[in-house]
Amino acid sequence: AALCSREDVTADIPLLRVPDTLKAAQTLAAAYRRRFSLPVIGVTGSAGKTTTVAMTCAALGSMRPLRTADADNGQIGMTFTLFNLDASYGCAVLEMGMSLPGELARLSEMGRPVIAVINGIGTAHIEFFGTREKIRDAKLEILSGMPEDGILIFNGDDPLLWDLKGALPRKTLFYAQHNPAADFLAACESTDGVSVLQFTKP
């Protein structure tokens, strides 16, 4: 079967005619996601999302995580990633991108993350927002689909995120390389061409 928004289209398969195929697909994806109780981690930020997803999946390898394809993080890509869920996965790590206000809220409400990572606020798509503060506010839409006991993980070296310490209605943890007040300090060491990233709690 297929979703179709045009009356003049015919096919040899059943067609479900809807006003907006993307909205219909997202409604179906959200309903399908609700069939699974597995934990979901949502990852957003202005840069480094795909790397963060890859590293998170490597750390959670024993749980066989479902992940979004590299940088396929938009309204269509993440929607169809959710349709790949099945009982063989122990968790999901979803990259959530956005370029306009409201987009991240829709992704979060579909994916329903229990943990959300924001790895930084840059200037990507600033032409649609005007300021980095407004980009940050749009990134915070990731809270839209989270439960009340969800956990936020923020880059504590980013002043725009650090300013939110104690201000959000979720447990919030900060990691950093240079901010000694963060909850976890990151250090990367390279030996013989092998890099090791470690997090320590001060």
Regions found by a protein language model. Give the residues of each.
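Short, acidic/turn-prone active-site loops that include or flank metal/cofactor-
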Residues: 20-23, 28, 71-73, 120-123, ...
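Conserved beta-strand scaffold positions in the cores of enzyme catalytic domains, especially
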Residues: 15-17, 40, 65-67, 172-174
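Residue-level detector of alpha-helix initiation sites
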Residues: 47-51, 98
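Acidic, Mg2+-coordinating active-site environments of NTP-dependent enzymes
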Residues: 1, 5-12, 117-202
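Short, basic phosphate-binding NTP loop
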Residues: 1-42, 51-58, 83
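A general structural signal for well-ordered alpha-helical segments in protein cores
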Residues: 25-29, 53, 75-78, 104, ...
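ATP-dependent carboxylate-amine ligase catalytic core
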Residues: 31, 35-36, 59-141, 148
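General beta-strand structural signal in soluble alpha/beta enzymes
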Residues: 3-4, 17-18, 66-70, 94, ...
